Each structure stands twice: as C-alpha cells, then as structure tokens.
Amino acid sequence: MADSDDEYDRKRRDKFRGERSDSYRTERRDDRRPVGGSAGARDEWAERNPFRGGASAGGGGARHRPDYSDYRGPGARPRYGSPGRDLPPAKRMRPDWGDADLRPNPRFGGYDPYLMQAWNDHYQSMHSAYSHAGHAPPVRESIGGGGDTLTQPAMLNLKQFLDTQDENISDSEVMRKYTEYKTDFKRQQLNEFFVAHKDEEWFKNKYHPEDSVKRSDEQRGFLQRRTDVFVELLENGTIGSVKVDSSQGDALIRVLDTCVIKLEGGTDEDLKVLDEKPKDPVVCERKAEPIESAKAVEKTINSPKEEKISEGDPLPAIVSPQRKTVKSVNSDEENWDDEDAENATPKKELGEDSKGTDSKPEDKQLNKKKTKKRKRNSTDDDSSSSESSSSSDEEKLKEKYDVEDGLRAEQKADAEKDRHEATKAKQEPESPKLQELEGKEIVEPKELDSKSNTAENDDTLKSPEISPTPIKGTDNGDDNKVEEDEKKPSVDEIKVVETETIDLDKVKNGQPRALHRTSSIFLRNLAPSITRAEIETVCNRFTGYLRVAIADPLVERRWYRRGWITFMRDVNIKEICWGLNNHRLRDCEMGAIVNRDLSRRVRPANGITAHKQVVRSDIKLCAKIALNLDERFRLWAEVPTDDSHPSRADESTENGSGSTYGFNSKNPVLQNITDYLIEEASAEEEELLGLTGENKDTDGEPIERDEQLISVLDRLVLYLRIVHSVDYYNHCEYPYEDEMPNRCGIIHARGPAPVRVTNNDVQEYIKTYESKLQQFLTKTVLLSDEEIKDLGAKDPETEVEKFVQANTQELAKDKWLCPLSGKKFKGPEFIRKHIFNKHEEKVDEVRKEVQYFNNYLRDPKRPQLPEHPGTSKRTESESARGGGGGYRPPMYPPFSAMPYGFGPPMMGGGRGGRNFPPARRELPLEHQRRLIGYHDLDAPANSDMFD
C-alpha cells in the first residue's frame, strides 16, 4: 500500500521526508536490504551519508533517500527538488543580501569563504577539505574574479608570513618585509575595489573629476534654493512665529509644508491650500451623482489621454476605446475584475449618454460587449450576496479610493470644482470656434475621418509613452497646444483640448495646488550597475512622474541600493507599482512597493532640552554645525572659488577664517550669536548667602525656560533642518532629501519637560549629546599627497608614459606599429608624436583616470570592504591549525592563492606538491616562549615522551 503509484503521485511524504530521524529510516529499510548487510550498506552509502555529494551538488548535499521522480518517470517537476540540481522558482530570484543572518553566498556552493566560522558551514568546510575517491578538494574562487564578497581576504599573520621566508633571515629583516607585505596588501585591496566599482554611477558621482563636479554643483544649487526659501520665510516672520516644541506640531508641519511648496515653485496663492481641511462632502456627492463618481473612479484607472479628455469635457465616447489599450499594457485583468464589477452600473449609464456623440460603431460594439461581460459578473455576484450588496460595494469603493490613499478625496473635490467652473466659463468664448469647426466638419468629412483614424491608431500605439503630458500640462497650457499641432485629432478632440487649455490657465491662476503632497514607490533592490537615467526612462512612461532618489550602496547589502520614485498625488500609485514590478532592469527585480505617507512628522525629544543651561549649550553646538556646513558648501562666501574636486572646499577651510561666530559669516541666524553664548550666574550672591549646589544635586531644580534663548535656538534648529537637512534633536542628517518624496518630512522637537532635573543629569546630557554630534562638528580633511603615496597613488605623467609604451609595438627593424590607429612608422618617436597629436582624447582619459583614482585615495571616509575578522581577531592557535601538512588536512577550506607570490597558500596543505609539513621556523625573540615538558607517568614504556 505504501509503495503504490497513487501514494507517490500525491506527494504527501515529500514534505515530511527530511523530518524523520535516521533510526526511523533504518528500520523501514532493513527489510529491503540484501542478506549481505555490508554490501547493502555500501550501495546505500551515497544516499545516507550527509557529506557525500556535497561537491557535485554545489555544496547543498544530496538526498537521503531515492527521489520519487526516479520511480514515477517523467512528469511534473517535484516541488521539493534538490537545490543543487534544480533551478530555484521565479519568486526566489531575489538575492539573500538583505537577510540579517548572513546566509552563505550561492556562488561558493554551500559555504561562503569569509563566513567559515559559522556553525552551519563547519561540517561542510571540514568535509570539503578532504579528497574523496581520487577527487581533489574543491578549488576556491579567486578574490578578484568573482565579484565582491562581504570582507577582504584574510591577511597573513606574522607566524604564517615566517613560513614563506628563508630560514636564515634576520629578525629585523622579517619585520621590515612583513611591514612591506601589509602595505602592499592594503594597496592591492584599494586598487581592486577601485577597479571593481569605477564604472558604477554612484562611485563616479563621488570621485570622478567630471561627474563629481556636476553632482556637487547640483547639490549646491539645491542648498542655495533652500537658503533663499529660508531667508524669505525668516523675513516675513514665518520662522519666528513658531517654536520647536512638540506641543506646536501643527505649526511646525505648516512651516515645513510651506518650505516644500516654495521649493516646488509654488506661489503665495498655492499656500492657501494649507488652510483647507480635508473635504468630507465628497461622499455625499458620490451618492447624489453616481455618474460623476464613476468618472472620478475611472480617472484613476484610465490612460493619461483619457484623464486629459475627461477633465475638459464629460463626453465618454473618446475615453472608452483607449481604456482597453492602456489596461492591456499597464495592468492585469485578474486584478481589476472586482473594479469592473463594481463600476458596471455607472458605465452602463455612461454608454447610454454617449449615443449622441461621434463615436464609431465598432467602438460601440466593444462597449456593449464590455458592459454585457460586466453585467454577467455583477449578476453572479448579486445572486450569492445579501440584500445589502449595494451598500457594501459603496463601502469597498470608498475604502479603495479614499481611505487607502487618505488625501485623494481632497484632490477629487478640487477637480470637481474646476470642472464646474470650466463648464460655466467656456460657453461664451468657445461658441464661434465651435461653429467654425462644425462647418469644417461638414465640408471635409472624409479628411477628418482619416485623421481621426490615424489619431486613434497613434493613441493606441503610444499610450504608454505620452503619460507625463497631463501632469505637466497642469502647470503650463502651452504643452497641450503643441500636442494639437503635432497629432491633428478629430473635431471632438480639438474641442476638448482647446477647452482644457483655457481651463488649465484658470486653474493655475485661481486654484491653489497642493504641491507638498506626493505619492511614491519604494524600490528595495537596485543593482549597482543600474543608472539613474535607466530608471527615469522607465518612470517617464507613467503619469505624473516627478523625480527619483537613489541611496548610496552598503557593503552589507552586497552594494545593492534602494530607491524612491516620486509621483504626483492624484495618480493611481498601485497601478504604477504593478507596472514597475512587471519590468526588469538589467535582469534585476526592483522590488517595487508603495511607500506609505509619514505617520508622525513631529516627534518628541527629551524634555530636558528646554532647560536654560541645555539651551545655551545647544546654541553653541548649532552655531558650530551651521558654520561648519556653510563653509563646506560655501553658501555665504563672497567669491566662490572653482575647485577640481567637490571635497576640495574642505581644504580651503582647514585653516578656517570663520572660527568665530557672526563676524565672518553673512548668515542672518549667526549674527550677534556671541551675545547668547556668554553664561551668567549669581555666584557671589550664592557664596554670601551660603547657597551651594548640594541641594540641587540631591533634590534637583525645576526646569528654567529662557524664551529669548529658546527663540534664538529655534531659528538655528530650523535653519539646520530646512537648509542642511540636519535634524538637530535627532542628531542625524537626512541625505539626498531634495530627491526624496518628502523634501521636509520629519522633525524632532522638544518634548514635555520633567518637573525637576539634577545638575548631574544636565551635565551628562550635554556631554553625551556633544559626542553624538561629532560627525557634524569635525571638519573633513583630505589626505595629503605624502599620505596617499603610501596607499599607492599614481603619477599622471608616469601613467601617460606607460600608455605610450603600451601602444608602441615593434614589428621589425625600423618598422613600428600604433595599435590605436593601425598605422606603421619608422621609429617609436614618430608613434609618440602621433599619439599626442591624433589621440589626445585618449591621453586625457588616462590623466582623468589617474585623478579619479587619487581622488578615491584622498578621501579618509572612502568606501571599501571591511577587514576579514581573522586578520584582527584570530588567535595564534587558530592560525596554527591551518599551517598545513600531510598528516592531517586543515580544518577549513583553503583560501584563494596568496597575492604577490608569497610561497604556499594561506591555509593550504604544504608547499607545492609536498605531502609533509614545511620545516618549522623559529619566531623572533619577542614572540618566543619557553616550552614546558610533560611526561605521563601512567603511560606504558613504549609511548612517546615530550620533554
């Protein structure tokens, strides 16, 4: 019964096979063994030994029992296949770098070369060090060929390095050579890292002579724009009217939103949107006017062309044929069936209203088929539902388009107002144009029909590519006029577009825009090779794309990055997210998910920050940070200097002409700041009255607030937050905030103050907080030329000479070849002249490459792989185990071949082909220790003795 084919086909035993113990399997298999138990054991050893098959199966181990598919024959692929022989399923192609447990790298089989101390890899590594059945141990991948790993390769310690040297070498010579080895090892790691990442965009933006300058100019432009907005708000009293207290959260959010609207190019008219509250009457309008609500629902699903037409004219005849095309490209039919069922009744009414329009009979037939199909779905749903199905449908509709997206109701209400105003305003001025167009329609019906056919075909073909136009059209109506001239649509489309241009101008002049609200998508997985331009090309196909932000790569994520894509608020962000998930860049799943809105924008800090002594200390720290950041980016400098490297500004301020506050800076928040940094105390009075600080230390003193000091501090805190994106009370910086969905999203403010506070608590808080802000207080100083020489800096002229020599080839006597052009010359000096005259751009590329590499070395915070834990933490006993030898193989797999030809592999089994350990070398005197003899008194007489 257990061996029947039906039992195998049901695959119920597959998922429990790995959970049964060895004893259970042994008992079940005893009756099937031959009489000669040894022969059966040998036959089944390959299936029962967990260490067999590790090398052939990629380190994953073989099955403990025969596969059911072997008995079953060809059929469906088993669900629980071997990881070494079967490809992983499609949804498991995401890399494992995001996991915190540091799972082994699949490149290296079942173990990772730099995580060999892990318990899961111990048995595999110990097994793979031995050879089985004449097969050599598996060869490890070289460090430079297979890409980056989590750490650098392990460096030899002194004892391992001694085994590579001659036995007669002196101690001083050993130490000198070992120092050279460590220096060369570091140089090689820096060079390998540079070669591996020099073609990636994030690396070029940091160190490339041209790209880094462009990036720094772009960031300086962002900072200058933020500075202008802050000064404007400071002058009109917006900054001075708010305090950075958690109790004034609404006022702080209003200030941040005002900054965002100004940064987006908004006007004072757009700031009125901050006074408007979310509209509740939208639900009532939806119940009273089902047609309008259906249009609002369709607006979020339709293509950009439909969106543009529905805003100008409520005629649905032009909308219906395009909706099918866009859904087939950007959406999935299975995911939108529910919405079709919900919208069946309103769309039927729309179809009846559109009978009087100029739509084609083919389009009408398509609409009828759609409505019949939706009717069928809706009747099936109604037959199985209760009497309250209509109300539940409305609740689903509200939850999907109002509750989930939160603020979309406000945008819809604004669109309804705009539509009503547009219909009132367009009637009188549009009448002569409409008459002329109608006359043209009567005179030339054939030409218009042909143009309408071509326009519809163009729309169906180009529907995913014209998506950005409606959103940008809300800011400028001229873009829509250009579309009219290019596409030449039919009469009805011309009416719609013309009325839309007029309406958009009125909306721009009279209706405030909520520029501070956006929708965004988070990309969890971006390969280092993916560029910003590639992401922008993909996103430009969707409606309302604004910008993209890409984070810096992290070593623990295997240099993969994260990204945020920002769209306008009124787009269907879920449909866009679905389209991005169906798109792959460079064979990489981006992992797009919808980014939620910020939950708490104002977050409380420690209430002790309101104490007068702490406030004065915070003013001092804020002034230092502001001065340091202003000098780094030269925001308030009189004459900006041109530098070849973006970080060169740090060197110009190293000797610092602005070390005092307010004197050498034109920053308005730093003017007269020294008046508030001088501490005052009634020390004489306390001494005469016998008042000491003992009572304050034991019982504490109440929180003392100085409103004047607090107002000065608030200006500094808001300046750092708005201009430099530094959240002072969270002691952190929000990087690349100008490209993020929320340009001024979160701020930390002073929380509720405690009743009493002791002097020790105040001093401890001040000391701790200053240590947390050291990253902003210290100036970044680039390494000097002498320091980067030790790291392997290159000379431009030397590298150019190497380039010339590499492109000078001698073919025969007095016959030389230049590989760059293929021309032949009589001597090398002619090739040299030829290269400098005809290939000057390639010589310049060599010089730029040298400067590129030196810029990387000059950065003290340069990215690089972390050191191997064995380099610094491995004890001598662990190192000695890997010394090699023929008697016992090493406990761990061998590393890659050692750089610079230093004799044997790092932890290999002896030198070359020898099968015995190398001669033991003596350590220098400072590393030697006295050997202690040992003799076992209970051992027999012929045993070994160690004296």
Curated annotation (Swiss-Prot):
Transmembrane portions of the chain: none
UniProt keyword annotations, A-Z: Nucleus, Phosphoprotein, RNA-mediated gene silencing
Any single Gene Ontology cellular-component annotation: nuclear body
Polar residues: bias regions: 654-664
Modified residues (Phosphothreonine): T300
Cited InterPro entries: SE/Ars2, SERRATE/Ars2_C, SERRATE/Ars2_N
Region feature (Disordered): 1-101, 295-493, 641-664, 855-890
Residues bearing the modification Phosphotyrosine: Y80
Intracellular or extracellular location(s): Nucleus
Modified residues (Phosphoserine): S82, S303, S331, S354, S431, S644, S647
Residue spans of biased composition, Basic residues class: 367-376
A GO biological process held by the record: defense response to Gram-negative bacterium
Family note: Belongs to the ARS2 family.
Function: Acts as a mediator between the cap-binding complex (CBC) and RNA-mediated gene silencing (RNAi). Involved in innate immunity via the short interfering RNAs (siRNAs) processing machinery by restricting the viral RNA production. Also involved microRNA (miRNA)-mediated silencing by contributing to the stability and delivery of primary miRNA transcripts to the primary miRNA processing complex containing drosha and pasha.
Binding partners and assembly: Interacts with cbp20, Dcr-2 and pasha.
Protein name: Serrate RNA effector molecule homolog
Species in which this protein is naturally found: Drosophila erecta (Fruit fly)
Lineage of the species this protein comes from: Eukaryota, Metazoa, Ecdysozoa, Arthropoda, Hexapoda
